Structures are given as C-alpha cells and as structure tokens.
Amino acid sequence: MASGAAQNSSQMACDSEIPGFLDAFLQDFPAPLSLESPLPWKVPGTVLSQEEVEAELIELALGFLGSRNAPPSFAVAVTHEAISQLLQTDLSEFKRLPEQEEEEEEEEEEKALVTLLDAKGLARSFFNCLWKVCSQWQKQVPLTAQAPQWQWLVSIHAIRNTRRKMEDRHVSLPAFNHLFGLSDSVHRAYFAVFDGHGGVDAARYASVHVHTNASHQPELRTNPAAALKEAFRLTDEMFLQKAKRERLQSGTTGVCALIAGAALHVAWLGDSQVILVQQGRVVKLMEPHKPERQDEKARIEALGGFVSLMDCWRVNGTLAVSRAIGDVFQKPYVSGEADAASRELTGSEDYLLLACDGFFDVVPHHEVTGLVHGHLLRHKGNGMRIAEELVAVARDRGSHDNITVMVVFLREPLELLEGGVQGTGDAQADVGSQDLSTGLSELEISNTSQRS
C-alpha cells in the first residue's frame, strides 16, 4: 500500500503550536467582526451561488489560516467545523436580488434558476463562525484537531515563464478526509494541476471546486474514479453558469489524482498529465485529450465543428485543447467530460508526477526517471527541490508556457536510490483513457516542498 506513515514527532510539534496560535488569533481578533469591521482576507467575488459557498469558504479559510501559519492539521479541522456551523444556518439573509440590466430574455430565465448570495456578507458571517470555534477550542482543543496526519513529501514548483500572466493553479490536499468530515477507514489524499487559458478564472475555479464536488459524490466510496468524473462535469456546469453571469471566456485543462487506501484514481480533461513511476519505470495512466486524436476529431466533427492545423491542431481554428472546463463559446466542441482510470497500489510505487503541457511538451515521459534519479543522487536522496529542477529543465528546453510540476513521493526518496534506475521506457498500465474503475494566490513563481 503506497501511503505515507503518520509521524508522531511531527504531530507532537503540531500539538504544541495550537495553543499559541489560538492565543495570537484571539488577541488579534478579541471579538466577532462588526458590520463596520474590515474583512481580514480577500472576499471571493461579489456574489456566490448556493452551490459555490462551501468550496469558496474553504479556500478563503485555508488561505487566511495559512497566512497566519496555523498548524496544517488544525487549519483543516477548524475550517471544517466553522463551515459546518455556517452551512447549518439560514443563508437566505445573504440572498442578492438580480441587478436590473437589459438582457436577452433567455439569459434572464437561465439566471433566475440560480440563487445568488452576497459574498461579503457570507465571508463576514464565516469569520465570526471561525472566531466562535477558536474561542471554544482555546479552552479545549478537540482530538479531531490533533489527529495524526499521514506524511507525504510533495515537491511543487510553478513559474509564469515568458507569458504575461500566470494561469496555472495546483492543489495539494493530503488531509482530504479531515477537510470534508469523512470518517471511514480509507485514508484519502488529493492532488491536482490545472492549466488555464484565456484568463485565470477557470483554473482558479477548478482548483477550488473539483475536490469539494468530489467529496459529495455518493460514488466516492464505491467508485472513486466515477466520482472524480462527475466532479469535473459538475464543476464545468457550475463555471459555465458563472461565465455567462460574469461574461468570462476562460477555460482550463486539468488532471487530478486521488489516493484512496491502496488504490490510485486519476481523472483528466485536456492535455495536463499525470504519470506513475514504479521501481524506476514509468507507468502510463492516461491518454491526454488533444484535437489531433482521431477519436476527438471524430467527436468534434460529429457535432458540427472542425479541427484544423495552424501553428498546431486547433478546435474550430481557436483552441489547442479538445476538452476543458469553461470555454463557454466553444461548447460542446470543447467537451467538459473527463476521462478517469484506477489502479491498485502495491507499495512498490516510487512517485506520482503531475504537470501541465508546459512541461510535458518538451520533456517526454521516458526522461523523467533519469532526471529525478540524477537529482536525488546529487542531493543525497533529498527530494525537496526536485520539482524546481524539473521546471528548470523544461524552461531550458524552450518551453515558453506557464510551467507547473508536482511530484508526490510514495516512498522515501532515499529508498529510490537503492535500486537505481531500473528502466527508462514506458510501461502501459492496465488502465486507459476511459473509466476502468470497475476492472494558491497568483504568483510568478511558486515553490512548495512540504511534509503534509
């Protein structure tokens, strides 16, 4: 079973940090926020739909608590408790009346189906729920906030590169169960990379909502791959509604990996990719969606669209991806339906690598193992900065795109040196590009290496 081990020493250090964090927090915020008090963290837009509230407040909470260096396990637990309390209240007081605008009648009918809530009011109410929970926990921190966390070494690096804007986003969520209050015996960890185009809105939205939507799928426990597929579909549907309301035109490809017990489940849209390395050999888990793929080309043409070769293969002469969240004006040719696959883990797996096309367009799969092994040799088994080196390789090879690389070690990096590089070719997994489950802020450079 490929999973990190809970580290008691790390947890003891975390436990000792919680009282100090609570004391400092309540000293800075001695009372709930009044209506006149400035909000201590950026509000996610002006309005939220009912379906968006939980995910957006989770993002707000984790960003705010992270900025105050809250212990990670505590941040997840207090976020879950505060949001649970807020969602049990009547949110109708935050309902926003639609603005009076001259709109097409059809658009007005569509808007009427969505209840919009005031984001600023929700954020203020949530901060007060957070304050209330922290006040209660200052007296007695519950065991759930001190529960041992599974340890993962995750190396992440992202750069804007030569592009004007950074449109990539990524998610590293080893405490998936704790964040969503899942109490079964299956440990779950979630990792994702989203590669936006035409703006950052879609990538940011997907990085906030896909895992929250997945957590609510009934199939999460019985068919996780199907749950991930549905989470992508639902996120696309929600973002399209937002895009029509706010006149957004962006889209995003994406890839995610959910480790659930002794199984790995992946889902993807577009050309962001994930590979698994096992005993020094690349295991191909997926086939990226590209317009030149014969099945994708046939699907697009059957809908009345076309695929043409310009500087690269493009859908309807515009987008270089055939599936994505968003891209409201290219639906249904650019599909929001993800593919998914599953694989049992044996404990012999080395690491996962998730990356956008800014990396994989210039670094083929079969070169990854050699690059990682060389880095570990030079750094005596320390994998903390491996993602940074992989990004540098892609940049030096001429990638001009945003580049994001995430390496999730499934074994201690030092152990990987003992066997050497056993193979550099691709091994085809027993999963393909179909569902076989039954067989952070916009920064130019983001570097994260963590035990989480």
Swiss-Prot record:
InterPro entries, sorted: PP2C (IPR015655), PP2C_BS (IPR000222), PPM-type-like_dom_sf (IPR036457), PPM-type_phosphatase-like_dom (IPR001932)
EC number(s) on file: 3.1.3.16
Enzyme class, broadest EC rank: hydrolase
CDD domains associated with the record: PP2Cc (cd00143)
Modified residues annotated as Phosphoserine in this record: 452
Cystine pairings recorded for this chain: none
Catalyses which reaction(s): O-phospho-L-seryl-[protein] + H2O = L-seryl-[protein] + phosphate; O-phospho-L-threonyl-[protein] + H2O = L-threonyl-[protein] + phosphate
Gene3D superfamilies documented for this protein: PPM-type phosphatase domain (3.60.40.10)
Keyword Heme: no
Domain PPM-type phosphatase: 153-410
UniProt xrefs under SUPFAM superfamilies: PP2C-like
Cofactor: Mg(2+); Mn(2+)
Superkingdom of source: Eukaryota
PANTHER family according to UniProt: PROTEIN PHOSPHATASE 1F, PROTEIN PHOSPHATASE 2C
Task performed by this protein: Dephosphorylates and concomitantly deactivates CaM-kinase II activated upon autophosphorylation, and CaM-kinases IV and I activated upon phosphorylation by CaM-kinase kinase. Promotes apoptosis.
Protein name: Protein phosphatase 1F
Organism: Mus musculus (Mouse)
